[in-house]
Structures are given as structure tokens and as C-alpha cells.
Design a protein with these regions (language model features):
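Structural recognition of the conserved hydrophobic beta-strand(s) that form the central parallel beta-sheet
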Residues: 17, 41-47, 68
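Short regulatory helix/loop adjacent to the ATP-binding pocket of P-loop NTPases
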Residues: 33, 50-66, 80-82
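Conserved catalytic/switch belt of AAA+ P-loop NTPases
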Residues: 28-44, 58
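Conserved nucleotide-binding/hydrolysis micro-motifs of P-loop NTPases
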Residues: 48-52, 72-75, 108, 317-318
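Interdomain hinge/linker elements that couple catalytic modules in large macromolecular machines
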Residues: 75-252
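A cross-kingdom feature that marks ATP-driven nucleic-acid transaction machinery
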Residues: 174-344
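Short glycine-rich substrate-engagement loop in P-loop NTPases that contacts/grips substrate
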Residues: 1-15
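Walker B catalytic acidic pair
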Residues: 20
Length: 344
């Protein structure tokens, strides 16, 4: 603080940038002191939301703004990538959108950078900050989440996975804590299930997506690169970058069988994207090669009885089209590269 004050020598505006402020003991006091310097514009950065978003926003409510920086979107990535869009797509879904990746020339350098970033930054920060004693347990959970992106799960289900696959007992309470640590460190994001017709959240199962797919792939040694699951994660990230709150949708339908017994069936909508009074229902469908697959992907959308836009994103490089139910099908490239792609 003394160092900063000594350099503010006149009435001109000074810009103070403090990186990883959460590493400074009693950083609230430092920021409070700087708030009284009228000609200082202070920018604080950090890689752990628990010690920034929760503490700083609460402490300095009304006296500052929070900006959440994401890795590069695909369109931003392509502005720095030298090559065609499909080569860029393969590069992006393999090595992710951290800006430094664009400056590395070989696949080996990119993979080493991402592995080191996870091991020496993410993992160390999470373990030390939260005093996690069982590194192997936490690390294994991160890999399980990485290998099952887009799959509904909860702490109890993950605890059972540890028991059945790894023959290790990890309590659901411990897993819930570990997941929250990953979220606070911006490693993953949680998307909660939402009953569209019932207009309420369902807290039984959620989905987790990686903020950067390069980190996700590095966790798995660049194996398990199922393009369909990765595409779903990329669409989720794109929606978040565009400022949408994203839930996993569920449509419930009740019918009766020939014995007049009630049958309850659930249909999933990959994403319910909300922003103000706007809402979009979005399906990630890697391919729809035949009528059966098309019926499968549209089944949940046709059962939603409101007027919000319904979109299916496919990997095929197609012209956007709209069917008789008003459902728009659009290719992944148009969806990611056109800023108004959701308004077709």
C-alpha cells in the first residue's frame, strides 16, 4: 500500500492493477484504503471466485463492478488462428480457448502447457486454499467429471461411482465440497435441471461443464475426446459467454396405458438459456442422419407449449432451416461464428 501511495504524486488519474489479490493477507483493508484515493481507478484480478466474488462484492457492494472473464469463444479464437474454420474447430475442441495456446506452435507444447497449468495452478490453488488433505481423491473426482461432461449426476451418484469403479469410499458430503471448490476456481460450471412445464428447479441431478476444454482434455491425457459431448460443452460455454443463465430442461408428459394406469415420461432439453425476458430452448445434436434421429431430438421441443424459440445445433455445415413446428436447425459454425445466430 505504501508502494502505491508513493507513486500517486499529482491529481491525475492513476490506474492500479492488483493481480491475484486473494494471496495478500487482509486484502480487504488494502482495497478499502485505495477506495479513499479519489484519483485511483483500481482493478483487482484473481483466479478463485470464493475469495473474490463472495468477499469483494459483499464488502464493496455499490462501489465496484465484477467482470467474469471466460476463455476465448470460438469466434474470438478464430480471429487469432491461422487456418480454415474446420481445422480451427479441431484445434479448439482439443486444446481449448486459453489465449496463450495460440502462441504455441506444436501439439506437444500445447498439451504440456495445459497439463502444467492444471497441476501447478488449478490443483495447487484448490488444495492449498481449501486445505484438502486427500489430493488423490480430489484429483480422481476431477477426472471422473471430465470423463462424463454432460451426464446428469449428483454427489451421491458420484460416491457410488467411486465405490463401484475405484473400490474407494468417498462420502457424498466430501464430493459436494470438492465440486464447490472446482466451481469457485472456475474449473467447472454447474447447470441445474429445470422442469419447464412445472416451472421449478429439480435438485436431484445436475450437469457439469468445463470452463475450458483444453484443461478438461489435459486431465484425461487427451483421450476420450468424444466430439459430440465436447460440442455440447462448447455450446454451453458459448451461451455463458453471451451472457445467458443456462439450465438443463426437462419436460414431463403423463399418459395412460390400456389398463388406465398413469405412465410418466421425461424428455430432456439440453439447454434452457435465459437472459432478461428472452428464453431459448437448445438441443445439441451432433448429427441427425435419419428421420428416427430427428424425431428423437425434436421430441422434447415439440412438447413445450410456450412461444420461446427452439433451436437444434448440428455439426453439419448446413443452411439454417425452420420446420413446420417452428424449430430452427443450424450448423455449429453458423451458431458459433454469427453473433445473431439465435435470432434466425
Amino acid at each position: 500500500l505504501k508502494h502505491i501511495r508513493e507513486r500517486i504524486q499529482d491529481e491525475g488519474m492513476y490506474y492500479v492493477l492488483l493481480d491475484e489479490i486473494q494471496l495478500v493477507p487482509n486484502f480487504h483493508e488494502v482495497l478499502n484504503s485505495l477506495l479513499h484515493v479519489r484519483n485511483a481507478d483500481v482493478y483487482v484480478t484473481g483466479s478463485n471466485s470464493k475469495f473474490l466474488s463472495k468477499d469483494v462484492v459483499t464488502e464493496f457492494r455499490g462501489r465496484g463492478d465484477e467482470i467474469h472473464l471466460h476463455p476465448l469463444s470460438f469466434s474470438e479464437f478464430m480471429q487469432g488462428y491461422q487456418g480454415d474454420k474446420w481445422n480451427g474447430w479441431r484445434e479448439y475442441y482439443t486444446f481449448g480457448g486459453l489465449p496463450f495456446i495460440l502462441s504455441l506452435e506444436t501439439e506437444q507444447k500445447k498439451s504440456e502447457y495445459l497439463k502444467n497449468l492444471y497441476e501447478s495452478v488449478y490443483l495447487v490453488d484448490i488444495l492449498e486454499r481449501n486445505k484438502v488433505r486427500n489430493k488423490a481423491e480430489f484429483d480422481e473426482l476431477a477426472r471422473i467429471i471430465a470423463s462424463s461432461i454432460g451426464s446428469p449426476c449428483n454427489p451421491t451418484k458420484l460416491s457410488n461411482t467411486f465405490k463401484s469403479v475405484k473400490n474407494v469410499t468417498v462420502s457424498s458430503a466430501s464430493i459436494a465440497r470438492y465440486l464447490s471448490y472446482m466451481e469457485y476456481a472456475f474449473l467447472i460450471e454447474k447447470s441445474v435441471r429445470y422442469n419447464i412445464k412445472g416451472k421449478k428447479y429439480i435438485n436431484t441431478l445436475s450437469k457439469y461443464y468445463f470452463s475450458d476444454l483444453g484443461i478438461r482434455n489435459a486431465l484425461l491425457g487427451f483421450r476420450q475426446q468424444e466430439e459430440s459431448h465436447i460440442m455440447e460443452n462448447i455450446i454451453y460455454n458459448e451461451l455463458r459467454i453471451r451472457g445467458y443463465h443456462v439450465d438443463v430442461g426437462m419436460v414431463e408428459e403423463r399418459t395412460t396405458d390400456r389398463n388406465n394406469k398413469t405412465i410418466r415420461k421425461q424428455y430432456e432439453v439440453d439447454f434452457v438459456a435465459n437472459q432478461g425476458n428472452r428464453r431459448y430452448y437448445i438441443q445439441s445434436a451432433f448429427a441427425m442422419p435419419d428421420e428416427a434421429k430427428t424425431r428423437q431430438e425434436t421430441a422434447s421441443l415439440t412438447r413445450i407449449d410456450d412461444s420461446f424459440k427452439k433451436i437444434i445445433v448440428v455439426k453439419d455445415d448446413i443452411m439454417p432451416k425452420r420446420d413446420e413446428n417452428g424449430i430452427v436447425t443450424i450448423g455449429i459454425m453458423d451458431f458459433l461464428l454469427q453473433p445473431d445466430s439465435m435470432d434466425y
